[in-house]
Each structure stands twice: as C-alpha cells, then as structure tokens.
C-alpha cells in the first residue's frame, strides 16, 4: 500500500515549554518525537517543519550582547539558518531514538532550507514582524541612524523598542527536489524550519534578506511543491473553534474552505495565532483537487490522520 506523504507543521509548544535551556528543549522534542513516530508507524511519510521564534529571538540577544569588531553580530537570515541546524539536530536525535524504540528503520535528516520571496512583495514596504531584543528609544534611534542603516524599529506595547522586519509570502522552496529525493529513499525530513531562510533570486545568484516568513505559509508552499497528500498543522488546541472562549464556542470538525472564508470575514480567528493557520489550510486545500489540511494538537495527530480528530479542511 502506498504511503501517504504528509507535511507536518509543528507549533512552538512542541519545542519550548517555558524553559529556554538546551536540555529542556531537547526533553520537549523527545516527547514530540514519540507522537511523530506514532504517525510514521501508522503509514505516513513525514516532512516536518517547525517554528523558531523564541530560539531566533534568544540568539539575536546573544549576538547583540557579544557584538564587537572581533565577534561581530550575524544578520537575521544567518541566525535563521543557525536555528534550523540547532533545532533540526535536536529533533533528528529524538526521532531516531523514538523510531528505534518502536523497532522501526529509517533516519531523520535536516535540510537547511532557502525560501524564495519577491523583492517587490508589499511586506517590504511595511515591516511589521517584531524580532529580537528590546531597546530604549535612544538606542533604537541611534541604530536606525547608524551607518548600517535600513533598520526599522517600532515601540512594542510600551515594553520598549524592537526591530521590525517584513514578512513576505513564500514563492518557491529551493530545496524541494532534494527534500523529495530524501523522502523517496525512506528518510524522515526536517525542513523549512522557522519558515525557511528568506532569499531573493536574481538569475543564478541567490542572496539572503532580513525578513521572517510565516512558518505555516512556508509549510503550505512546501506541501504544494512536494505534492503532499495532506498538510497537518499542529498547535496548542485540538480543534479550530468559532466564538472562541465564549459561551457559544463551537469546534469545527469538518469544514469547507468557503465556510472558513466566511468565518474570516466575521473576524473569528486571532491575527497572530489561528488566522495564519486557517489561511494556510485554505491555500493548501484549494491548491489541488483532493488536498486536505488538518489542524489539531500534537496528542491527537495520529487520530487525525484516520479522520477521527481535529479540524479537517477540504475544498468546497
């Protein structure tokens, strides 16, 4: 029986649960890997993506604190690639152990993934994504006026000033053929971590750019390009809900893309959390006839693959 190719987008709770130490994050990923191994055991070929918000934020603080002519701070796009390697390494080890415990073969492999964006994307005119450490107003203005120039800072809810960067839409994933080859040879692939490293293509040349790609949209684009059967977006809740946290709250179990578009117009989903997941779910479900997206929690992921849990999104 042909295995289903599934792109799984891990939420932040799958990696970091409050303690930012390496050991705590490794422990969180050990638990996450057991759930992923259950999915593999049920007959799925997995390509795993993940977020990196807390990790890249902490790394940028470290870069700032150690910045000097001898140890210069690395740019954001380089920090994204560094966190892809770090989280990928931890998850590879955890998955290999989880599969071994189940008597399963196969190995996990991490692909440092570049994601092409358009240089004329509207997001570059209006950077909105806050990243990295907080600064005083004086420090922020000094950095904006420095010879490094081009940096944009905004006040963040009275907590200080933070750098803001564009969040452009992913256009293509440069390594998608490599990822497919690894899957076809029986490997579990970890790719497009943190939304991927954003790059601009100019003929044969590729150059990184300081931006942050939404991880759910990157997962959606990856699922399209590798022709996945399903996109599974794992988050902190079991179902997508309308009237969330109200007495009239209702879980959505099977829903069409058109129904979800109606709920978006009603502003049912929060901007910074569920809305991008729902939009990515719609995009993948509508990309090709027969595509399906599932949004659920990590603990229900295996049941969701059987159609017994989570919010299942299908084309209208």
Swiss-Prot record:
CDD domains: AAK_CK. Pathway: Metabolic intermediate metabolism; carbamoyl phosphate degradation; CO(2) and NH(3) from carbamoyl phosphate: step 1/1. The keyword Cytoplasm applies. Signal peptide: none annotated. It is an enzyme of class 2 (transferase). It catalyses: hydrogencarbonate + NH4(+) + ATP = carbamoyl phosphate + ADP + H2O + H(+). Its main location: cytoplasm. Keywords: Arginine metabolism, ATP-binding, Cytoplasm, Kinase, Nucleotide-binding, Transferase. GO terms for cellular component: cytosol. It comes from the Bacteria. Its EC number is 2.7.2.2. It is found in: Cytoplasm. Belongs to the carbamate kinase family. NCBIfam families: arcC (TIGR00746), PRK12352.1 (NF009007). PANTHER family: CARBAMATE KINASE, CARBAMATE KINASE-RELATED. This is Carbamate kinase.
């Amino acid at each position: 029986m042909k295995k289903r190719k599934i792109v799984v987008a891990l939420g932040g709770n799958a990696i970091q649960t409050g303690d930012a130490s390496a050991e705590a994050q490794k422990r969180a990923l050990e638990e996450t890997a057991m759930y992923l191994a259950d999915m593999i055991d049920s007959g799925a070929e997995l390509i795993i993506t993940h977020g990196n918000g807390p990790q890249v934020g902490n790394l940028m603080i470290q870069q700032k604190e150690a910045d000097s002519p001898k140890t210069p701070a690395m740019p954001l796009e380089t920090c994204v690639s560094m966190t892809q390697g770090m989280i990928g390494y931890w998850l590879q080890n955890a998955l290999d152990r989880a599969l071994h415990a189940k008597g399963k073969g196969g190995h996990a492999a991490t692909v440092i993934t570049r994601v092409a964006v358009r240089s004329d994307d509207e997001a570059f005119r209006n950077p909105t994504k806050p990243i990295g450490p907080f600064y005083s107003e004086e420090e922020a203005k000094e950095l904006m006026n420095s010879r490094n120039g081009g940096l944009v800072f905004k006040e963040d809810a009275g907590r200080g000033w933070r750098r803001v960067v564009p969040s452009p839409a992913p256009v293509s994933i440069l390594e998608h053929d490599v990822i497919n080859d690894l899957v076809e040879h029986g490997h579990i692939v970890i790719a497009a971590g943190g939304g991927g490293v954003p790059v601009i293509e100019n003929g044969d040349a590729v150059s990184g750019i300081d931006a942050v790609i939404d991880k759910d949209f990157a997962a959606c684009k990856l699922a399209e390009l590798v022709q996945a059967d399903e996109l599974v977006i794992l988050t902190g809740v079991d179902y997508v809900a309308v009237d969330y946290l109200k007495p009239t709250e209702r879980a959505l179990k099977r829903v069409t893309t058109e129904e979800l578009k109606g709920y978006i117009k009603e502003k049912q989903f929060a901007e910074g959390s569920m809305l991008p997941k729902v939009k990515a779910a719609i995009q993948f479900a509508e990309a090709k006839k027969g595509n399906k997206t599932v949004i659920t929690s990590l603990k229900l992921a295996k049941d969701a693959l059987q159609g017994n849990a989570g919010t299942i999104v299908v084309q209208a």
